[in-house]
Amino acid sequence: MKFTAAVLLLCLAACSAPVEPLMIKQFTLRDQENSVADDPMVQNEKLRRLHGAVSIEERKQRLGQYYAVLWNADAAAEKEIVFRYQQGASGSRIKEMRRALPTGSSSGKEEFSIIGDNYFKNGRVLAWKIDLTANGETIASKQSYLWE
C-alpha cells in the first residue's frame, strides 16, 4: 500500500511543469467594430478593452497594442520589468517603459500599452524585448523575432 502511494506521488511530481518566470500575451485592437465573424475570444477582448469608452474619440484613444506580462520571481527580491520597443515611425530609436514590482509578492501581471496618439503618430510596434530583473540582475527575458 505504501509502495503504491509512493509511486503515485512520484508520477504526480513528474507530471508537474516548471513555472515560467516570464510570459507575454499580445493583443492589437485595430478597430472599434465588433464583428460576428470575429472569434468569440477576440470579441470578448475587444469589449474588455473598449469598456467604459463612451464617445467615438474615447474609443479611438483605446486603439493600439497591448502587452500583458505575467511574471514569477522571488518574493523577497527587488523586482522590475523593463519593456523596450521600436515603433514604425521612430526608426531605429529604442523606447523604454519600466515598472517596479512590489516586494513581497512572488507573481503578478503588469500591462504595457501603446495606444491612442502614441500609436497613431509613431506607428505600430515592430520589435520588442521584455526583461524581468531581480536585485539588478536579469532573471528572464523574452523578445520578438525582429528584435536585434
Model regions and ranges:
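Sec-dependent bacterial lipoprotein signal peptides
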Residues: 1-16
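Contiguous beta-strand segments within globular domains
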Residues: 38-73, 109-114
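Extended, low-complexity, turn-rich repeat/linker tracts enriched in Gly/Pro/Ser/Thr and Asp/Glu
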Residues: 73-77, 120
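Extended low-complexity, serine/threonine- and proline-enriched intrinsically disordered segments
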Residues: 77-95, 130-132
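Short beta-strand elements
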Residues: 138-148
